[in-house]
Amino acid sequence: MEIIFRGAALEVGRSCIEIKTDKSKILLDCGVKLGKEIEYPILDNSIRDVDKVFISHAHLDHSGALPVLFHRKMDVPVITTELSKKLIKVLLKDMVKIAETENKKIPYNNHDVKEAIRHTIPLNYNDKKYYKDFSYELFSAGHIPGSASILLNYQNNKTILYTGDVKLRDTRLTKGADLSYTKDDIDILIIESTYGNSIHPDRKAVELSFIEKIKEILFRGGVALIPVFAVDRAQEILLILNDYNIDAPIYLDGMAVEVTKLMLNYKHMLNESSQLEKALKNVKIIEKSEDRIKAIENLSKNGGIVVTTAGMLDGGPILYYLKLFMHNPKNALLLTGYQVRDSNGRHLIETGKIFIGKDEIKPNLEVCMYNFSCHAGMDELHEIIKKVNPELLIIQHGEEVQATILRNWALEHGFDAITPKLGEKIRI
């Protein structure tokens, strides 16, 4: 057996791992790394005979390179949950649309997206299937609705658990991960390490701090701009704003609108579905340019809240709103998600400047950060590792510092742990 790390090795983004035996070849995820330039996994000609692709969840860093396979005329089934399939379709179509609008080249088109979705076979959680020399089963990963950890049981008596992105604790939107796979012996655990060196602050305390800041902005007549990931963070923020009964107009813009409506068709996968329905009814939805113009008029006069994409400021309506509102210190930008290295959001944090188009600008509004992560914190990662108790621990999907700290902890606790480099191959 050989495991090849085609992406997300000592980095966050472009998740893609190949597992190859004498009888089968699969990919675990096929994502992109978003930033000023889009980076792709190593997808050379050796992947042409892949038997199956498993997608852990819809986020583009796990699904965004999937159409590349179909652009190359590959005929390969894709396995994921039904909700992930629907979300992936929305996100991939949007990626093509943005590329066309911004005149950026990406290595696939709308036809390739359609082919990727046509080849996608939905699979329920806890429904074991068999193929060639292995069985496979999906377990709820607790990261976002529809996310899955993937259990692979090979005939050579090697069992592999790929966590994907995972979270043990409940959030308002999603219930924590199902770890029932720990009842079986697992030889190899492939685990994320986004927060391999830090414990998340108390969620309730973060919410209260966030709400207090919004009230402060509204009291001074300002606009609170809240950039969000369309999948998960947008809905989590809507649930929080709804729960605290914020008395101000809340505008929901960008792809978050379509995604929220889609999620409400899968209420069994949501933690607070009735509250999300209520939250959506209480916001002003921006569906066309006239809505946006009217919203900007009202915001300029009276202040208010804008919840919109993109969460890392690399595109989407947030840049339009920033261009208009970033020169007034009464206004504020409230970052609610992880800012990947080389993203516009990370650039703002590190330099105090932001790119809008080709212009690098120093905004004159307040910038705040809040940890509403849907990833496991360091303590949760430790808990998973201890419960699984693998013979080999493979740490990926984390920047070098985070991955290395998690590896060192694992080594100190008696685990055989590695942090593979991009392109590295290991034999089992």
From Swiss-Prot:
Family matches, as InterPro entries: Beta_Casp (IPR022712), MBL (IPR050698), Metallo-B-lactamas (IPR001279), RibonucZ/Hydroxyglut_hydro (IPR036866), RMMBL (IPR011108)
Cofactor: Zn(2+)
Keywords of this entry: Hydrolase, Metal-binding, Nuclease, Zinc
Enzyme class: hydrolase
EC number: 3.1.-.-
Binding site for Zn(2+) 1: 57, 59, 143, 165
Entry's Gene Ontology molecular function annotations: metal ion binding; RNA endonuclease activity
Residues holding Zn(2+) 2: 61-62, 165, 397
Pfam families (UniProt xref): Beta-Casp (PF10996), Lactamase_B_6 (PF16661), RMMBL (PF07521)
Domain of life assignment: Archaea
Protein family per UniProt: Belongs to the metallo-beta-lactamase superfamily. RNA-metabolizing metallo-beta-lactamase-like family.
Function according to Swiss-Prot or TrEMBL: Probably an RNase.
Name of the protein described by the UniProt record: Probable RNase MJ4
Protein's organism: Methanocaldococcus jannaschii (strain ATCC 43067 / DSM 2661 / JAL-1 / JCM 10045 / NBRC 100440)
Taxonomic lineage of the native organism: Archaea, Methanobacteriati, Methanobacteriota, Methanomada group, Methanococci
